[in-house]
Amino acid sequence: MTVSGPGTPEPRPSDPGASSAEELRKEGNELFKCGDYEGALTAYTQALSLGATPQDQAILHRNRAACHLKLEDYSKAESEASKAIEKDGGDVKALYRRSQALEKLGRLDQAVLDLKRCVSLEPKNKVFQESLRNIGGQIQEKVRYMSSTDAKVEQMFQILLDPKEKGTEKKQKASQNLVVLAREDAGAEKIFRSNGVQLLQRLLDTGETDLMLAALRTLVGICSEHQSRTVATLSVLGTRRVVSILGVENQAVSLAACHLLQVMFDALKEGVKKGFRGKEGAIIVDPARELKVLISNLLELLTEIGVSGQGRDNALTLLIKMVPRKSPKDPNNSLTLWVIDQGLKKILEVGGSVPEAAGELTVTANSRMSASILLSKLFDDLKCDAERENFHRLCENYIRSWFEGQGLAGKLRAIQTVSCLLQGPCDAGNRALELSGVMESVIALCASEQEEEQLVAVEALIHAAGKAKRASFITANGVALLKDLYKGSERDSIRIRALVGLCKLGSAGGTDFSMKQFAEGSTLKLAKQCRKWLCNDQIDAGTRRWAVEGLAYLTFDADVKEEFVEDEAALKALFQLSRSEERSVLFAVGSALVNCTNSYDYEEPDPKMVELAKYAKQHVPEQHPKDKPSFVRARVKKLLAAGVVSAMTCMVKTESPVLTNSCRELLSRVFLALVEEVEDRGTVVAQGGGKALLPLALEGTDVGQTKAAQALAKLTITSNPEMTFPGERIYEVVRPLVSLLHLSCSGLQNFEALMALTNLAGISERLRQKILKEKAVPMIEGYMFEEHEMIRRAATECMCNLAMSKEVQDLFEAQGNDRLKLLVLYSGEDDELLRRAAAGGLAMLTSMRPSLCSRIPQVTTHWLEILQALLLSPNPELQHRGTVVVLNMMESSKEIASTLMESEVLEILSVLAKGEESPVTRAAAACLEKAVEYRLIQPNQDGE
């Protein structure tokens, strides 16, 4: 009996609608046999919708279960099998499939019950008996593990809570063992059921750093992906208590609490872990309510006095990760709307905090930037004008409340809040700038004698210059003021900010060589001063960040780029600053590097359109002579020599909300520029570029992920993938490469992805399975029909390597498709490289699947001519592939061998067999020996 694929029903009388349902079921069966499990699933679903009989419904449900098993969606497989069993309790196939799904879900006790039922229904079925023995062994092993774990858990808690063991090595080892045990599902469950949460609460109450870290990390294991345990833990510890740990001064403890809260949030939002679904009924709660309680406490923490700056940053980081939707396809943004209504003012309070002012919140250098990012994420998550208008109204009301009637301190906070908005949701910031008196106060405070007031005002002026309309206003009204501050102020902190304002205004023309805001040479002088401050170690990192901001704007000018890459000291200072705790510098560093490598999107204008624009007296942007490819390549080499890859690798590893998706995109663009030249790729790999590109290709903006994936493809093509991506990392490369096969990507990206996948497919069966799992085969097949010869060739080469997999061989062997015909026809094309790939695939397939040999004469009448052309080719590789195909065909059938020997193939093989010793002569000789064996030809008298 077969239990792995869709079943065949017993004959039954037909009824209305049954014929179409029957056709769909048969279609689904064929698709299943071909490996198209999603297509089969669709066919079975359509058949169910046609109102089939209960018997048919049971068959269709169990067939859907088989599809879900193949697609590794075990929860749905269990559900479908259960529906089949409800219709027919004696459906042994459905019972077996449900047991397979339950086993994968870890619910072994339930899987055993189904298997016992299967054995009782079919006692002689060896498949059922073997499966029952395997699961029985797994259950016994789990029981032994759990019983031995009981004593270990009790012993570890005794050591940790014993006051006599304070600071001993024994206590440290016990805490480490507890954390390790909690990482396993069974261990976490054991700790939880052994009153572990209450005991861990006692560890938290000790106040000792080591014990608190051990407790928090153990709680991470207990709560990870398990909703009921998470709710129980929050109930015992109290949500307020857990959140309050974020605010402690110790950074390690605060980070551990941040990780725990992230895990708790994931468990609440994503729901139940599949492996423990059967045990979730212990606690019935509303996850949405628990979620809001958790977020509400985080919002309260933002404005609490006594909370550490690091704790406030961690709370903002959690809100950034928790609240906005992961994808715009998700229609529900209610959590974002709730946070805006309940907590927007609290977020603005952090963003508007004025450092060193009396009564202000404790913040770090990154706090206000994190608040800006959170505000930006919330604003971007809004779906309609009404929601955005509400956001604007709340922001404006908050700013007015401080600006009007709160004196100078209130005006400073209002202006600081506007700066925060300008760095985040700039639309809201620009609207706030238009409020009565705000811009005038900014200009007036720039001339204040108090450093704090000047800092706030100048920063607001810099951020306000971001829009062209605002920049032109400030150029007309504020440039003189900024110049006076730059030249006249005695404080470096003021001078450097004024300089950045001038830099920003000076770069308003972007890369357009013909648009210059300042006189010739002024931008070079500004850049020189920025580099001077950047290299000054005596200035704190927060102030030096502004020098990088200035360079990020000035490097639009190619002259500035050339001088910057020549200044080794400035480059080293830039890279060193990017590794510092001053995380808010990351975007500016990325912008400067994008400008230096010209890795922004640029399209050559149509010459005819340029002439038309000139005739119409319209402005036409001009490219700087030093932005030509030869200059760009030289700059890239200088950056590589200065260690840019190592610096960028450190930036990618940054766990901070400041590393936004936009920042990731900048880094992806730079990496792509760095690997453009083949000779530079070894340097990038040696400095860790391959490892850094993986997270960039998996997370970020669509453009950023595509750029990073293309850089990965370039590295995979020219470097040994096993050296570039050692260990398990090589399997992570597949998904980004497959993403480049989508039609939205350019032809070059498609081509490079195909070449990279070809290399990976030739390494191991596990990699080929990973490519198949990512559903790349249909896309690769599509590109085999591409008009562009290089893409068509690359797709064929990739398919040739994938043909080593059983699943791909099944696709070629399936009836009703032209896959084999395409390879045969391509083996006769004029493109020699395409012929080599197609003939190689044909040789492999006929070797692995002899049944395909008999189908070659059926796919085209020109098959014999194509084989003869391969045998007569001057290229030894094509000759070898041709002789192997002929040998495989002769070994598969005497009839085919007879047809071949009656043609000119015999004469060609005879000539080839007499050549010098080579794979071709050996294969040709084997063909002739097979013909002799079949008695189709006679051996020579001398035995040759």
Swiss-Prot record:
What the protein does comes down to:
May act as co-chaperone for HSP90 (Potential). Prevents the stimulation of HSP90AB1 ATPase activity by AHSA1. Positive factor in promoting PGR function in the cell. May be necessary for proper folding of myosin (Potential). Necessary for normal cell proliferation. Necessary for normal myotube formation and myosin accumulation during muscle cell development. May play a role in erythropoiesis in stroma cells in the spleen.
BP terms from Gene Ontology = cell differentiation; chaperone-mediated protein folding; muscle organ development
Q: Which InterPro entries match?
A: ARM-like, ARM-type_fold, TPR-like_helical_dom_sf, TPR_rpt, UCS_central_dom
Q: Which GO terms describe its molecular function?
A: Hsp90 protein binding
| Annotated PROSITE patterns | TPR (PS50005), TPR_REGION (PS50293)
Its cellular-component GO annotations read: cytoplasm; nucleus; perinuclear region of cytoplasm
Keyword Manganese carried by entry = no
Region Disordered, residue ranges = 1-25
| Keyword annotations | Acetylation, Chaperone, Cytoplasm, Developmental protein, Differentiation, Myogenesis, Nucleus, Repeat, TPR repeat
Q: How does it assemble?
A: Interacts with PGR isoforms A and B as well as with NR3C1 in the absence of ligand, and with HSP90AB1. Binding to HSP90AB1 involves 2 UNC45A monomers per HSP90AB1 dimer.
Q: Which organism is it from?
A: Rattus norvegicus
Q: Give all N6-acetyllysine modified positions.
A: 70, 483
List the protein's name: Protein unc-45 homolog A
Q: Where in the cell is it found?
A: Cytoplasm; Cytoplasm, Perinuclear region; Nucleus
> Repeat TPR: residue ranges?
21-54, 58-91, 92-125
